[in-house]
Amino acid sequence: MPKCPKCGAEVKEPIKTWVLAPKGRKGVIIGLFRCPNGHYFRAKVGEAPPKKEAA
């Protein structure tokens, strides 16, 4: 569970997630979180599979 960098509160569920990956390489899944004190922050949620190139 990610912790808020400002207040240290643990947050369970992200508001939104997206894949951040360079071309042809393995990327990461980033999540946008909001702590109980109202601070927004981003954190790594998981690993993304490598993109498959079209032939």
From Swiss-Prot:
Subcellular location: Chromosome; Cytoplasm
GO terms under cellular component: chromosome; cytoplasm
InterPro entries: Cren7_sf (IPR038647), dsDNA-bd_Cren7 (IPR020906)
Modification after translation (UniProt): Methylated at multiple sites, to varying extents.
Gene3D superfamilies (UniProt xref): Chromatin protein Cren7
Segments passing through the bilayer: none
Pfam families, per the entry: Cren7
Keywords carried by this UniProt record: Chromosome, Cytoplasm, DNA-binding, Methylation
Top-level taxon of origin: Archaea
Quaternary context: Monomer.
Family statement: Belongs to the Cren7 family.
Role, per record: A chromatin protein, binds double-stranded DNA without sequence specificity. Constrains negative DNA supercoils.
Protein name as it appears in the record: Chromatin protein Cren7
